[in-house]
Amino acid sequence: MVRVAVSGAAGNIGSTAVEAFQNGKYDVTPITHREHEGMDSVVLNVEDRDAFVEALAGHDAVVHLAGRADPTASWEDVLRTNIEGTYSAFEAALVNDLDRLVFASSNHFHGMINIDESDRPETLTATPQAVYPDDPMRPDSYYGVSKITGEALGSYYADRHGLEVVNLRIGWFLTEAELEEKLSEPENVARFARAIWLSPRDCRRAVRRAVEASLPENPLSVNLTSDNESRYFSLARTINSLGYHSEDDSSSVV
């Protein structure tokens, strides 16, 4: 049985990722920064490398989702949790000789490409251009910068140490009810939500494939949204490299 650890397991995406591995094929270890009622988890601060090393002992892969998921976060906030914490995750994976690390990157890696208001990261122009994984980085926030740094770390650990790395550039993870609420916001925010929505069901499928799939290249960076009618992030590499198939579309919800 494959042993998978999931950091940030109490978050919205983290708890969904844990569900993805509760199918009898995996032994999943949730990692959280504090205790949560109803969840049996390993509790640690992701900046504590020694604790992270201990937590990953005996595992085959780690899905690293822990971090400050906020495009308004300060440099100090992302430096500690997103950058130092991600370094700890890679070091812990290396020390324990894990096969693979799946990194929760973000659409904010390319956030400035189609932004409608440069000081509001989650807005979308009325005529967005297609965005591909190999397009030059254009972060829209310190949060986006922290994800670029995480991917750079992944490139180093893949090339130098042979660790398999998958970077999932996640869209906007929302339940259907949350997506519907976004439509009451300004139109450029609603456009953004419709275009880059990632449903919980598609998230589970993608995270599982990121652990299971044979990689055509290492590291592998892919966009991750649902198959939305108005999406502008290309999913071609996600489909071809991971075998990801979305079943959801924001246009069928709103």
Feature map (PLM): residue ranges:
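N-terminal Rossmann NAD(P)H-binding glycine-rich loop of SDR-like oxidoreductase domains
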Residues: 2-24
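NAD(P)H-binding glycine-rich loop region in Rossmannoid oxidoreductase-like domains
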Residues: 36, 44-81
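Short alpha-helix in the Rossmann-fold core of NAD(P)-dependent oxidoreductases
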Residues: 81-86, 90, 102-105, 146, ...
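Conserved Rossmann-fold NAD(P)-dependent oxidoreductase catalytic core, especially the SDR/UDP-sugar
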Residues: 90-140
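Conserved beta-loop-beta element that borders a ligand/cofactor-binding pocket
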Residues: 105, 151-176
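Active-site helix of classical SDR
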Residues: 142, 146-149
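Alpha-helical substrate-binding/gating segment
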Residues: 172-188, 196-219, 227
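Conserved C-terminal active-site "lid" loop/helix of NAD(P)H-dependent oxidoreductases
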Residues: 183, 219-245
